[in-house]
Design a protein with these regions (language model features):
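N-terminal leader segment of winged-helix/HTH proteins
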Residues: 1-33
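Hydrophobic/basic alpha-helical segments enriched in Actinobacteria
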Residues: 11, 15-18, 32-35, 50-55, ...
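Pre-recognition alpha-helix immediately N-terminal to the DNA-recognition helix
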Residues: 14, 21, 41-45, 105
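Terminal interaction helix/tail motif
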Residues: 15, 105-155
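N-terminal helix-turn-helix DNA-binding core of bacterial DNA-binding proteins
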Residues: 27-66
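Canonical helix-turn-helix DNA-binding module
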Residues: 52-94
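Charged, amphipathic alpha-helical coiled-coil/dimerization segments
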Residues: 76-126
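Mid-protein regulatory/catalytic core that forms ligand/cofactor-binding pockets
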Residues: 140-192
């Protein structure tokens, strides 16, 4: 990523302002629902995260928030019946978070869906997504954060390792993965 000291091109600056404006429009749409923007983004993350990444700590890392802020956000989502805590069957000391059917219903009317439809209508889907992902990865790396990404794009992902419902494998976590798992975002993702 380019240094803050060197001026960006007018095109790059225009793109950054457009991304910022889109973010503001999404947050305004969130306010029109029963959720504040932090709650909406947390719900979106939990719906897109794999089973290993649906934890309060991973959510805090993804949002760039403190654990305390995320705790309050989760309490609000639980009170609204959109998220529930589940004991980790492998490690009783930790919990996993799950989006409830009501939460999934809420997401079916998510303002992000309208934005995705506009992007698709403009014919900019795949190229735009790739460019934005590269920009996001560079910005996150510059700030020392974790990128989060889909399992199937990770260097630890092993495709078609066994027959059955869980054909793929995560070499980092030594876990079998389903086809659906492969499309979800992971806190441990490392670009291939």
């Amino acid at each position: 990523m380019r240094s803050i000291d060197s001026p960006p091109s007018p095109t790059a600056l225009r793109a950054a302002h457009l991304v910022e404006r889109l973010g503001r429009l999404l947050r305004a749409g969130d306010h029109a629902t029963a959720l504040n923007p932090a709650q909406a983004e947390a719900l979106r993350y939990l719906a897109r995260a794999n089973r290993f990444s649906r934890t309060p700590a991973s959510l805090a890392d993804y949002l760039g928030s403190t654990r305390g802020t995320v705790s309050q956000t989760l309490l609000a989502l639980e009170a609204k019946g959109l998220v529930e805590r589940q004991a980790n069957v492998r490690d009783g000391r930790s919990i996993h978070l799950a989006v409830t059917p009501a939460g999934m219903g809420f997401l079916s009317a998510d303002p992000v869906r309208a934005l995705a439809a506009a992007i698709e209508a403009a014919g900019a889907g795949a190229c735009l997504a790739d460019d934005l992902e590269a920009s996001l990865r560079a910005a996150v790396a510059e700030r020392g954060g974790r990128a989060f990404g889909a399992c199937h794009t990770c260097r630890h992902f092993r495709r078609d390792q066994r027959p059955g419902a869980f054909p793929h494998h995560c070499a980092l976590l030594d876990e079998a993965l389903s086809e659906a798992d492969a499309t979800l975002i992971c806190a441990e993702q490392a670009a291939a």
